[in-house]
Amino acid sequence: MRQRTIERSVEVVGIGLHKGVPVTMRLEPLEENSGILFYRKDKNRYIELKPQNVVDTKMATVIGKDGVVISTIEHLMSAVYGYGIDNLLIILDNDEVPIMDGSAISYCMLLDEAGIMEQKSTKKVLRIKNEVEVRDGDKYVRLKPADTLSFDFTIHFDHPVIGKEHYHFEFSKKNFLEEIARARTFGFLHEVQYLRSIGLAQGGSLDNAIVLDEKKILNPDGLRFEDEFVRHKILDAIGDLSLLGMPVMGLYESFAGSHHLNHLLTVKLLEECSNYEIVEASTTTQEGYVIGAACAKE
């Protein structure tokens, strides 16, 4: 299986979730073996997509370098991962990725517009060899060895609409588009009100998030999936997993996970070389996920 980039440059204008200010985002092709690279045009600063550059995970996944940051990258990166893109330049003129509708589907449409192009170099895959786990009380995230990438997620909220939700997801581009990409971010009205009082969530609205009060969903059109909340948690995790810089072969299990735990898991995984091996992708399904590999450890 070969590395991929986009065929042509594309651009979109939206607003940032927290500051609520307009931001222009441009996606451009990159040559093979370049990886995913962000560029803050207003600060003339490049930031590589890697766990070492994560600077904040409280409300979103934020990367930064030398004091220059880019916030809320996870939904975009979930789409980039879903499309199997290895090399991409993401240019922004502000410090937030545009939130769009709060899911990944708008970014998927943007990538469809750009087109996907295979390159000459073989795609590298990170294969999990040893189980790695991070816990915070009863919350946990873990990666286990497996021959494909899949997610087994459970969330539990003390809310009559959400309660306990579980979803098992077998990763492929087709499944991503059908089951995960349209799942929106969500929040509670009292949290939104507090965030706005401290200058955050200025761009949040019912057009780009599911908002719940104490008893019900406030969005007039309701949910896109009965279990949209846990599906969005998987969307987030895919985006956070993209910071590893290559596709992953493993089972990702989570109970009440978060951006913070996702990040700690990627860091812990990379701490010990025995936890993983890097192989060349050799066999794929029609949808594009790896089901076999030729050993080529680096």
UniProtKB/Swiss-Prot annotation:
Listed Pfam families: LpxC
Pathway where it operates: Glycolipid biosynthesis; lipid IV(A) biosynthesis; lipid IV(A) from (3R)-3-hydroxytetradecanoyl-[acyl-carrier-protein] and UDP-N-acetyl-alpha-D-glucosamine: step 2/6
Catalytic reaction list: a UDP-3-O-[(3R)-3-hydroxyacyl]-N-acetyl-alpha-D-glucosamine + H2O = a UDP-3-O-[(3R)-3-hydroxyacyl]-alpha-D-glucosamine + acetate
Cofactors demanded by this protein: Zn(2+)
Recorded GO MF terms: metal ion binding; UDP-3-O-acyl-N-acetylglucosamine deacetylase activity
Entries under HAMAP family matching the protein: LpxC
Record function comment: Catalyzes the hydrolysis of UDP-3-O-myristoyl-N-acetylglucosamine to form UDP-3-O-myristoylglucosamine and acetate, the committed step in lipid A biosynthesis.
Family: Belongs to the LpxC family.
Name this polypeptide is given: UDP-3-O-acyl-N-acetylglucosamine deacetylase
Organism, as annotated: Nitratiruptor sp. (strain SB155-2)
Gene name for this UniProt entry: lpxC
